[in-house]
Design a protein with these regions (language model features):
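Active-site neighborhood of HAD-like aspartate-dependent phosphohydrolases
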Residues: 1-43
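Generic structural signal for small/hydrophobic residues in well-ordered secondary structure
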Residues: 10-13, 54, 100, 110, ...
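Short, acidic loop-to-helix structural element flanking the phosphoryl-transfer center
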Residues: 73-109
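Cofactor-binding loop segments of dinucleotide-utilizing enzymes, especially the Rossmann-like FAD-
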Residues: 113
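Substrate-recognition "cap/lid" segment bordering the active-site pocket of phosphatases
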Residues: 116-137
Length: 137
């Protein structure tokens, strides 16, 4: 007995590759250690998650620049070049999503923690994001 009628697909890491290193590795001229220090202490995952939770990108960026003025250019780059952090689509997962969409047997729901300010960038770039009946943030 199968009572499953809804499938949920996460966006970042499941359907779409996302990684700040796509921007910052170039900026740090390939120096992984320096890049990691910057991403772990200045523009950390925790800091980014605050914006994913709804905090203004502009306000968060300005506050971070005030804390680390010597890194202003790099801090402003974090959201200024966010689109470049979007890598490729995970084609196997997108193909699976398309199969479910074409069979029209399941409700398809998307799941993301991306900010309401960054999500439209992904929506514009990846057509398959429009296949979902709803999106949970």
């Amino acid at each position: 007995m199968n009572n499953v009628d809804t499938l949920i697909f996460d966006f970042g890491g499941v359907l779409i590759d996302w990684n700040p290193a796509y921007v910052f590795l170039k900026e740090f001229r390939g120096d992984q250690e320096e890049m990691s220090h910057f991403l772990n202490t200045i523009c950390s995952w925790e800091w980014n998650e605050n914006q994913d939770a709804g905090y203004s990108l502009q306000k968060a960026t300005d506050e971070r620049v005030a804390m680390y003025p010597e890194h202003e250019r790099l801090i402003r780059m974090y959201y200024g070049r966010w689109e470049e952090m979007l890598g490729y689509e995970h084609s196997d997962t997108v193909e699976l999503l398309k199969t479910f969409k074409d069979h029209n047997k399941y409700r398809l729901i998307g799941l993301t923690n991306w900010s309401h300010e960054t999500f439209p960038v992904a929506l514009e770039r990846f057509d398959f994001l429009s296949w979902f009946e709803g999106i949970v943030v």
